[in-house]
Amino acid sequence: MKKELFGLSLIELQELLVAAGLKKFRAAQVYQWLYQKSVTAFDQMRNLSKADIAILEANFTLLPQQLKILREQVSQDDLTRKVLLEFPDGNSVETVLMRHDYGYSVCVSSQVGCDMGCAFCASGLSGCIRNLTAAEILAQVYIFNSMLVREGKQVSRIVVMGSGEPMLNFDAVIGALQFLHQENTLYMSYRNMTISTCGIIPGIEKLTQLGLPINLAISLHAAEPELRIELMPVNKGFPFQDVIQAAEAYVGYTGRQVTYEYILIAGKNDSPVAAELLANHLRFKHASVNLIPANPVPEKGFERPSKKVVEAFLKVLQKHKINATVRREMCKDIDAACGQLRARFAQEQQD
């Protein structure tokens, strides 16, 4: 049975290649092709002999080469590309490439589906099927990086904001981020990495203890207990007041500002009173607020508030000296909400 090479450390790669009959120095060459040049086929590694390539192809697989793109959507401005990737076991996740003036970001999933049950999210419609491995998280990045290297560019930022709760797959997520930080991979700064959580406090505490300057984003979406429970059942186990306290400990240890994400849902959590409640909880905190007008999710029945309502909410926060912005629209014309592309594909397969 062939062994998977993608996502291994250089030492692990050396051990496998030597055991297969290759010279030890070949591991460094393969490593460079995989993680610096984003080549995911052995026969494209031009400084390897035909005999070495034959050994590699006979004994090993490369995960990115096995991924199947089930669906792909590109925004009209060509700045956002969203794909539904199928893994060899038949499970699929969404991942997104976003082109910015300042670089190229990839939004990755950490689980197949999600168990958090957030009312506004399509990712949890079928629950969490399984965690992704670190290699599967990395493969999402390298699928897009292989496209960018042909343009002389590379992925410069990663946000763990796709399907799944990253803090419930902590080791794999951190393993993938640490891998990308290595000098012989993408050498990505931790300051260009963001983990978004719905508020799993033990995970926030573990991240604090690591002491890495990774950006932390908290999915808040309501600052009133009953409403947050309605929107995010996780609030029953981890009340948002305690989540904010854990986030402040993270700030104190790392010096990094925490971002609070707040999806504005028409008639639900978008009133001036809701804005005042949010400001009361975040005042004097080392925090910023990212307001996100809701992407309509047909399965949930939620709608986007008007521009006037969004601006009124923003003004309340600014009045209280809260650093707040409205997320720039980059993919309104595609299935942008988390889980929508996967849910749409699943529905098509049933019809």
Residue ranges and their predicted role:
Residues Q76, P88, R99-D101, G199, ...:
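A generic beta-sheet turn/junction motif
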Residues M1-N91, E248-R256, Y262-D351:
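Auxiliary Fe-S-binding modules of radical SAM enzymes
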Residues S92-L97:
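A short loop-to-beta-strand scaffold at the N-terminal edge of the catalytic core in hydrolase folds
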Residues L13, L79, Y104, Q154-R157:
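Exposed loop/turn and edge beta-strand positions of beta-sandwich/beta-sheet ligand-binding modules
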Residues R99-E136, Y142:
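Canonical Radical SAM [4Fe-4S] cluster-binding loop centered on the CxxxCxxC motif
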